[in-house]
């Protein structure tokens, strides 16, 4: 929140115990973000959210926030490997 930019290669990962409807909002976020909703490492939804007003929901056991444009070409059904 309140960051003016998101560094290249940055990802914020939110793991959850089980798959459920997860809501992401952009209140107080100043830059657009690409968001991936994953279930068992499979993408269920991809969306670019706008600063301040964006909101979206999706089924996920993991949610990944990325710099805008980082998820270009990623589609529902793709597999994502999280490497820490």
Give, region by region, the residue ranges found by the protein language model.
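Compact, glycine-rich, soluble single-domain proteins
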Residues: 1-84
């Amino acid at each position: 929140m309140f960051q003016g930019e998101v560094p290249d290669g940055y990802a914020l990962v939110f793991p959850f115990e089980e798959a459920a409807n997860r809501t992401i909002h952009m209140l107080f976020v100043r830059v657009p973000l690409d968001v991936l909703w994953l279930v068992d490492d499979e993408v269920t939804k991809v969306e670019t959210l706008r600063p301040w007003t964006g909101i979206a929901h999706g089924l996920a056991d993991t949610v990944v926030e990325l710099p805008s444009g980082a998820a270009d070409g990623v589609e529902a059904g793709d597999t994502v490997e999280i490497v820490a």
